[in-house]
């Protein structure tokens, strides 16, 4: 049974919400749900966060999660070039015991991030060796492996802010390092959302038609947003990517009615990222359908505007003929932000985007659209509209 099938989405979101609250809410959580189930959920989350191990010698790290008189023991096999995975207690040498109180581990994983360098957990090296001579004999074989293996497991037991560029490389996404250099921009614009219980929708799961590829970007966002729920939309079936806090949806980003339906079901979203087909008409359809489902204060991101110049993607080689492209959309958003400054026209009324866009940040091949109430008021009509009259009015009549 996978984490995705054992833990339904509503339960996971409820656990995350309560874990970020007051101690009374943590108590409510452990009364509302079976502690054994919570323990399994936490281990599934930890395994998804652990970096690649560096130890050459296989070793087991025992993760013990304690709640009152109950003790839930999980043995994790750690070795280089393999994912960390649960095994039986007799399937290797236990190099380290790591013990957490259930509520402490809930806070470490799903609470609002806080630095607690000490006093969070208990540890014991070579916990099941009772003979000192035997322990000395094992030092040469397992000491380094226990250290490196424990480091990898503990890295998955917290919510310290990761480096997005490193995550992009770990999960093999094109957002940094060879085709693009987006991660510094993402870090700048996403950092304030990191500790929130965000809902992120990314269009384009990756891997194209390959039945086993894709999902790297979704895993990157899952790691970056430790309390977030990540959705991925793709024209192909990418359900093999589904796991705890990641859900994929199959569908066409150029189908406005479909986009509206999924947004009503899974939104509103804090962040939408369009890294889909990059066909210009698709980009514009998706924005029109999904921007209304971004919450106030949220972001809509468009990647890969280079296709605006490529006719094979519905683009225009001449920048002056860009009205139907992704860049044409972005250029129109500047007027939308400034709509209250446009000359009065009885035949024109502000649209939804005009009233709900407050910022636009455009970089090489990636743009961030800020949503909010765009109603600060234009310059009053009694302010002169020509320079000389403005100077005279502002000079108190002085000449």
UniProtKB/Swiss-Prot annotation:
Changes seen on gene knockout: No production of mycinamicin II and accumulation of mycinamicin VI.
Span of the signal peptide: none
Active-site residues (renumbered): 278
Broadest EC class assigned to this enzyme: transferase
One GO BP: protein homotetramerization
Pathway: Antibiotic biosynthesis; mycinamicin biosynthesis
Entry-linked InterPro entries: MycE_N (IPR040800), SAM-dependent_MTases_sf (IPR029063)
Residue numbers binding Mg(2+): 275, 303-304
Impact upon substituting residue 278 to A/K/Q: Abolishes catalytic activity
Effect on the protein upon substituting residue 208 to F: Decreased catalytic activity
Result of altering residue 279 to V: Slightly increased catalytic activity
CC cofactor: Mg(2+)
Catalysed conversion reaction: mycinamicin VI + S-adenosyl-L-methionine = mycinamicin III + S-adenosyl-L-homocysteine + H(+)
Binding residue positions for S-adenosyl-L-methionine: 173, 202-208, 217, 234, 252-253, 275
Function recorded in the entry: O-methyltransferase that catalyzes the conversion of mycinamicin VI to mycinamicin III in the biosynthesis of mycinamicin, a 16-membered macrolide antibiotic.
Protein name from the UniProt record: Mycinamicin VI 2''-O-methyltransferase
Source species taxonomy: Bacteria, Bacillati, Actinomycetota, Actinomycetes, Micromonosporales
Designated gene of the protein: mycE
